Amino acid sequence: AGALPDTTDRPDTPALADRFGREATDLRLSLTDFCNLRCTYCMPESGMVFLKKDQLLSVEEIVRLVRIGVERLGIQQVRFTGGEPLTRPDLEEIISGVASLERRPDISLTTNAIGLDHRAERLREAGLDRINVSLDSVVSETFERLTRRPLLHRVLAGIDGARAAGLDPIKVNAVLMPGINDHELPDLLDWCLERDLQLRVIEQMPLDADHRWERSTMITAGDVHEMLAPRYALAPVAEPRDGAPAE
């Protein structure tokens, strides 16, 4: 890794802060734009042109970037995302490099878990602390409708592999789509609780892959409450720090 940049003439700012004084201590790094799924709310079914391998950040560049963040900018947590980060064969090397930093940050991964069953142990040994798995349905037909790929069995195998490797806690990120999987939410929560997984319903982002995003069709927090209230007793919890939507 190269030397740190000269900050002599820069303001003495020990942390990343916005104009409201809120400090950013989390760093999200997309390791690739490629994904082996084609979720309807994220990518078009075909026609995607992805970056070439030599256009992606190298292991050394990623570790150097994180080192600058933790040593100069107050970064405490690093999350690797994509695309699908597991499609990088050097992911273990990336995580090991970051975990070996003198000021080691918390290291997490957002993944669809395809192939994780074969790598979970190595990733944990490299220094991975925890994972978030993107999973919108445990019903094969619904999963394939949303992802355009018949790969639910591989996602579930990946989750089982992560559990066996001790990557706790495992959080499941679910995007609810009206008329497609929203009615499955109570059963999905049951499935997660049976496996000691933490379910998080996340807001659909307006990536507009198929030019169908409309605010009026979004599932709200109130909608989620109404779906779960008949089966569960719900109680408010403390707000996460500064919202922390990506934790």
Predicted regions and their residues:
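Auxiliary Fe-S-binding modules of radical SAM enzymes
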Residues: 1-27, 190, 194, 201-207, ...
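Generic beta-structure capping elements
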Residues: 32, 44-45, 134-138, 202-204
